[in-house]
C-alpha cells in the first residue's frame, strides 16, 4: 500500500486525532465526553475516522497516494456462534469494531486490509486480565478463530478464516483495544491473551502500520471475495454498516454503524459510484 517512509507521519497524525476525539467525544454528532468502552468505540467511528482522513490528506497527497478508511460499530451486532475449544456451542459478539483500509491510489480499490477489535477498559496498571465467562468466550473466539456462523441477515454457511491465503495468521484478524480512562483515554492494541500487558502500539500507530507495504501482524489483507476472511469483512460493510445504533450514555441516536472517509479525494474517470469499498 504505502511506503514505510510515511508511517511515522501517519502514525503521529492518527494518534493525535484519536486521542483528541476520545477525550471530548464525537462533538459533531453531539456526543458528550465518553467514559466507557462502548462510548469510546462510538467516538472512534463517528469522530475519529473523518478526523484521521483529514489529517492524513496533506501527508498522502504530495506523495500521490490515496486511502479510504471505514470504521464499523459492531458492538453486539453481529453475534458469532461457534464450537469452543471444550466442544461446547457458544455465542458472542464478533467484535466491537471493524476497521478497514482500502488503497485508492489508482482511483479504484486495489488492496484492502482489515482488523476486528474488541474494546476493553484497561486496568489501573494499564493492562488487563480476562477471567469472566463472557470474556473467556470472546477470547476463545479471537484466539483460535474456529469455524463460526452469523445470523440469518448474513449470507448462510460456516466461516473459517483458515481459508484465507494472504500472509499472516488467523490471530492477525483480531486485536484487543485496551483503553485507559478519562482524562487521558489512550487506546493501545494488544494481541488476544488471558493476561495482556500495559503499552503496545497506540491505535493510530497500529492503523498507520496497517498501510505499510509488505507488513504482517497489523490486521490482515482482505482484498478477495472468495476466502471467508475477506467475505466476512465485505459482509460487515454491506450489512452491519448499513444499520443504525443507539447508545443512551451521552450520545443521542440513532447513528449509522458504518463511517467511511477518504484521505485523498480522487476522481473516478468512469463516473460510477463508490459503494462500500467497491466501484459499482
Residue ranges and their predicted role:
Residues 15-83:
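Acidic-basic catalytic patches of nuclease active cores, encompassing PD-(D/E)XK
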Amino acid at each position: 500500500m504505502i511506503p514505510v517512509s510515511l508511517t511515522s507521519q501517519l502514525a503521529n497524525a492518527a494518534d493525535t486525532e484519536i486521542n483528541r476525539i476520545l477525550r471530548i467525544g464525537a462533538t459533531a454528532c453531539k456526543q458528550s465526553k465518553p467514559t466507557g468502552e462502548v462510548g469510546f468505540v462510538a467516538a472512534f467511528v463517528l469522530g475519529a475516522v473523518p478526523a484521521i482522513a483529514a489529517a492524513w490528506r496533506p501527508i498522502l497527497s504530495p506523495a500521490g497516494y490515496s486511502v479510504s478508511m471505514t470504521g464499523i460499530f459492531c458492538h453486539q451486532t453481529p453475534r458469532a456462534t461457534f464450537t469452543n475449544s471444550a466442544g461446547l456451542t457458544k455465542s458472542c459478539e464478533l467484535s466491537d469494531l471493524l476497521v478497514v483500509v482500502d488503497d485508492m491510489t489508482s482511483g479504484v480499490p486495489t488492496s484492502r486490509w482489515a482488523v476486528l477489535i474488541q474494546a476493553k477498559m484497561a486496568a489501573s496498571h494499564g493492562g488487563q486480565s480476562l477471567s469472566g465467562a463472557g470474556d473467556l468466550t470472546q477470547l476463545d473466539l479471537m484466539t483460535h478463530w474456529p469455524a463460526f456462523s452469523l445470523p440469518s441477515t448474513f449470507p448462510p454457511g460456516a466461516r473459517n478464516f483458515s481459508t484465507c491465503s494472504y500472509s499472516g495468521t488467523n490471530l492477525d484478524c483480531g486485536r484487543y483495544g485496551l483503553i485507559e480512562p478519562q482524562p487521558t483515554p489512550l487506546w493501545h492494541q494488544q494481541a488476544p491473551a488471558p493476561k495482556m500487558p500495559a503499552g503496545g502500539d497506540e491505535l493510530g500507530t497500529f492503523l498507520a502500520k496497517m498501510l505499510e507495504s509488505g507488513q504482517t501482524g497489523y490486521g490482515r489483507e482482505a482484498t478477495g471475495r472468495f476466502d471467508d476472511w475477506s467475505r466476512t469483512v465485505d459482509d460487515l460493510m454491506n450489512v452491519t454498516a448499513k444499520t443504525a445504533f443507539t447508545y443512551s450514555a451521552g450520545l443521542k441516536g440513532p447513528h449509522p454503524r458504518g463511517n467511511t472517509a477518504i484521505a485523498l479525494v480522487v476522481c473516478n474517470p468512469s463516473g460510477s459510484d463508490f459503494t462500500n469499498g467497491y466501484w459499482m
